[in-house]
Amino acid sequence: MASKRIPLVAGNWKMNFDHLEATYFVQKLVWLLRDAHFDFKRCEVALFPSFTSLRSVQVLVEADKLHVAYGAQSVSVTTQGAFTGDVSADMIAHLGCSYVIVGHSERRKYHPEDDANIVDQVRAVLAAGMQPILCVGESFEERRQGIELDFAVGQVRDVTRDLNEEQAAKLIVAYEPVWAIGTGMVATPQSAQDAANAIRNDLKTTFGTKVSDSVRILYGGSVTSKNAAELISQPDVDGFLIGGAALDVEELAKIARLALKSTKSRN
């Protein structure tokens, strides 16, 4: 990871933890990291609770002045009105969220979100003053065909073609090969680097070096404390979007410490 980009360790809780469990987790995570003298200025930690827990997490973080960011797992493209079950970007922003996950493979699969909808989500998140974490990645079929890099880059390009330079610079990309999510299988560090580098080069071609050098690219897919150090040692991998391991507070703290350690080795 390039030292000028602050690593981001993002824990996606998916549909786990009620609001009481969520606040307990946040408290324990901060305690574990503080005990390890964690430098939150050199490595960012963010959590993604369910909608029902966001307000509880906000109250805790603001009251105790905790150095943990948080965000939402999805967002509606509409602002208000008769859209039962939807939650707008402005509503999420008013809860103090910094980030919103957009285009996660589970959203694409179970709540069919097409490319146009994902573009609209990204624009809604940006308009509300937050940063979108755009999830991209290939299935086994694309990988079998040898088109995984083109596929991931194409997913990013489908979004960035509608953004200007200022908007693109605020984008965070999470490369999550679908075949590695929740399976225990993980991309090799070189595969993760190849994908991240291809995405960054495409951003450079479209927007220039200033934008491409500023965009953080995360890896997701069966990340654990056993493989995190080698993954984040890759020059274009700037952190993680973590699923299963993010439900274990001690494991998540270990991964965060490894991400922080990677910044020290590059200075």
From Swiss-Prot:
PROSITE patterns the record matches: TIM_1, TIM_2
Swiss-Prot/TrEMBL catalytic activity: D-glyceraldehyde 3-phosphate = dihydroxyacetone phosphate
Keyword Transcription regulation: no
Pathway: Carbohydrate biosynthesis; gluconeogenesis; Carbohydrate degradation; glycolysis; D-glyceraldehyde 3-phosphate from glycerone phosphate: step 1/1
Active site, UniProt feature: 104, 176
Pfam families attached to this UniProt entry: TIM (PF00121)
Keywords assigned: Cytoplasm, Gluconeogenesis, Glycolysis, Isomerase
Localisation per UniProt entry: Cytoplasm
Gene3D superfamilies cross-referenced by the UniProt entry: Aldolase class I
Assigned GO CC terms: cytosol
GO biological process, one term: gluconeogenesis
GO molecular function annotation: triose-phosphate isomerase activity
Binding site for substrate: 12-14, 182, 222, 243-244
Classification via NCBIfam families: tim
Subunit organization: Homodimer.
Stated role: Involved in the gluconeogenesis. Catalyzes stereospecifically the conversion of dihydroxyacetone phosphate (DHAP) to D-glyceraldehyde-3-phosphate (G3P).
Membership in a protein family: Belongs to the triosephosphate isomerase family.
Protein name: Triosephosphate isomerase
Lineage, opening ranks: Bacteria, Bacillati, Actinomycetota, Actinomycetes, Bifidobacteriales
Gene: tpiA
